[in-house]
Amino acid sequence: GIEAASVAERFDDESIANNGDWLARLGALKSYDEAVVLDVTASKDLAQRYVEIAQQGIHLISANKVAGSADSQYYHQVQDAFAKIGRHWLYNATVGAGLPINHTVRDLRESGDEIVALSGIFSGTLSWLFQQFDGSVPFNDLVDLAWQQGLTEPDPRSDLDGSDVMRKLVILARESGLDIEPDSVKVESLVPEELRELSLDDFF
């Protein structure tokens, strides 16, 4: 295993920059019984390679919500790609900060229960922001503070524009047995239009 206290140091010493061929190199590994990719990003580009990951015979554990909330065609394509070769695509970390919510919802449905409603606080970021905001600190400063503390998505506009909650709702709805598309969820953005296309540096 890896000692938690040494993770940052080992990453600095041993990490290898992505030069584009990492997936082929992983697929070529023959000295291990199983290989696993951990996707802890919010990258759309990486989510678009999930089928390739399956085709390399690699398991995938993902906190990335993009594939699980993609259009139904791609979502089922990814599911089928892993199922066909007996590999796992595990994505419980996409909703609930690691709590077994996806698994619980799926287990209820598969045991014959009818899920009629799901309710909760679906954005820890927005919950924190509105708990803190009392007018004494500008809202944009609170957003910056939340980002610095790792409470937001890599780009906090994903929290503020509603897309992060939309993705979680789509994932949970699908786990509940609904056939739903992302554009079925009505989203109202809190991000002013003039800030939506700026770089992250310019946004802050």
List each language-model region with its residue ranges.
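N-terminal glycine-/serine-/threonine-rich beta1-alpha1-beta2 phosphate-ribose binding loop
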Residues: 1-55
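A general structural motif
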Residues: 33-34, 57, 86, 115
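A generic secondary-structure micro-motif detector
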Residues: 38-40, 68, 159
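Rossmann-fold NAD(P)-binding glycine/threonine-rich loop
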Residues: 43-56, 65-93, 97-108
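Hydrophobic beta-strand scaffold residues
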Residues: 60-61, 89, 153
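Rossmann-like NAD(P)H-binding beta-loop-alpha module
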Residues: 83-86, 90-149, 163, 171
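Substrate-binding/catalytic subdomain of NAD(P)-dependent oxidoreductase enzymes
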Residues: 132-133, 140-204
